C-alpha cells in the first residue's frame, strides 16, 4: 500500500494542536479543522468545514474530547460522499464501547478505523515524546509510521480490534491517577513529620516507592509551585470513570479503582474548571489541616 498523499487533522485542542504542528513540519500536506478558527499550525491548510478535510485527505487523525463527540463526527463523516477507502485514526480517549461504535459506523461506509489513543500529556505532545497505542491492522501502522514518528517517540501495536487501544490507555491513566493521588497523600504524611519535600522525593526516587509522580510531577510541577503538567483534573477524572465503568463490564477486580474514582471525583469538585491535575496535592493538603 502506498503512503497517504494528504493528511487531515480534526480537533486542535490541548493535544491536537501540538501533534498537528509536528505533522505540518513533515513532507505530507496537512489540512486541519477545529470548531475554533485560527488554531491550525504554520505550514498547514486551515478550513472551516469538516467536509473539506474529508474530501481532500485520505488519512484523517481525530483528537477530540470524548466519545459522544467522536461518534457524532464519525456519523457525519460516514454520511459524506466518496469516503470509501479512507482511514480514520482516532487518538482520543473515549473508552472501548465508543471506539467500537465509531468503528462500526465508519467501516459500514467502507472506511478503515484505527483505535489509537496517545499518552504523555500536553507536555509530551509539545516535545513529540508521546506514545501512541495502536489497535488496528499492523499494515496500516507501517504505512503511516513516517507520519506517526513526527509526533510520537513510541508506537505500540496492542491488537487488531477497536477498543483494545482504549483499554490499554485507560489502565495507564488509572495507574497515573493512582500514583498522583497516593504520592500526594504519602508526601503530606512525610511533611507532617517534619521532613522537607525535596528530601522525601530524593529518597523515594531511588527506592521501591518511585513512580512518575515522584519522578516528574512533584519535582517539576509541585515543588516549583507551577502546577503545569498540562492535563486538566476533570479530564483525568473522566478517564478514571471510564476505566471503572469498563472494569465493571469486564468483571475484573475493582477494589482499588472504586476508591481512586471517589478521590478524583472529590478533587474535580474541589477545583475550578481547567485546573491542572497536579493540584490534587493542594486539595489533599487542605484536608489535612486542623
Could you tell me what each predicted segment is?
Residues 50-112:
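Rossmann-fold NAD(P) dinucleotide-binding segment
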Residues 127-128, 132-135, 156, 162-193, ...:
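Active-site-proximal catalytic alpha-helix in oxidoreductases
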Residues 93-173:
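Rossmann-fold dinucleotide-binding core
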Residues 1-63, 91, 122:
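NAD(P)+-binding Rossmann beta1-loop-alpha1 motif at the extreme N-terminus of oxidoreductases
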Residues 166, 175, 213-275:
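Interdomain hinge/lid region at the active-site interface
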Residues 270-290:
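NAD(P)-dependent dehydrogenase/reductase Rossmann-like domain
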Amino acid at each position: 500500500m502506498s503512503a497517504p498523499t494528504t493528511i487531515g487533522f480534526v480537533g486542535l485542542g490541548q493535544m491536537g494542536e501540538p501533534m498537528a504542528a509536528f505533522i505540518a513540519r513533515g513532507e505530507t500536506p496537512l489540512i486541519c479543522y477545529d470548531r475554533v478558527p485560527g488554531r491550525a499550525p504554520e505550514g498547514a491548510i486551515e478550513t472551516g468545514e469538516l467536509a473539506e478535510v474529508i474530501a481532500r485527505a485520505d488519512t484523517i487523525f481525530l483528537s477530540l474530547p470524548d466519545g459522544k463527540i467522536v461518534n457524532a463526527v464519525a456519523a457525519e463523516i460516514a454520511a459524506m460522499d466518496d469516503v470509501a477507502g479512507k482511514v480514520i485514526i482516532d487518538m482520543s480517549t473515549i473508552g472501548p464501547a465508543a471506539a467500537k461504535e465509531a468503528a462500526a459506523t465508519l467501516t459500514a461506509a467502507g472506511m478503515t478505523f484505527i483505535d489509537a489513543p496517545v499518552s504523555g500529556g500536553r507536555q509530551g505532545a509539545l516535545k513529540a515524546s508521546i506514545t501512541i497505542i495502536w489497535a488496528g491492522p499492523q499494515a496500516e501502522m507501517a504505512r503511516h509510521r513516517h507520519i506517526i514518528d513526527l509526533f510520537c517517540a513510541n508506537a505500540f501495536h496492542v491488537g487488531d480490534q477497536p477498543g483494545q487501544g482504549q483499554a490499554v490507555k485507560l489502565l495507564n491513566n488509572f495507574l497515573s491517577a493512582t500514583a498522583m493521588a497516593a504520592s500526594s497523600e504519602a508526601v503530606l504524611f512525610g511533611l507532617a513529620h517534619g521532613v522537607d519535600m525535596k528530601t522525601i522525593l530524593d529518597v523515594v526516587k531511588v527506592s521501591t516507592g518511585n513512580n512518575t509522580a515522584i519522578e516528574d510531577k512533584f519535582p517539576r510541577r509541585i515543588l516549583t509551585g507551577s502546577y503545569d503538567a498540562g492535563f486538566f483534573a476533570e479530564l483525568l477524572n473522566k478517564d478514571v470513570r471510564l476505566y471503572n465503568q469498563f472494569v465493571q463490564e469486564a468483571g475484573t477486580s475493582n477494589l482499588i479503582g472504586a476508591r481512586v474514582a471517589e478521590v478524583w471525583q472529590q478533587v474535580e469538585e474541589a477545583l475550578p474548571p481547567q485546573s491542572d491535575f497536579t493540584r490534587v496535592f493542594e486539595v489533599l493538603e487542605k484536608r489535612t489541616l486542623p
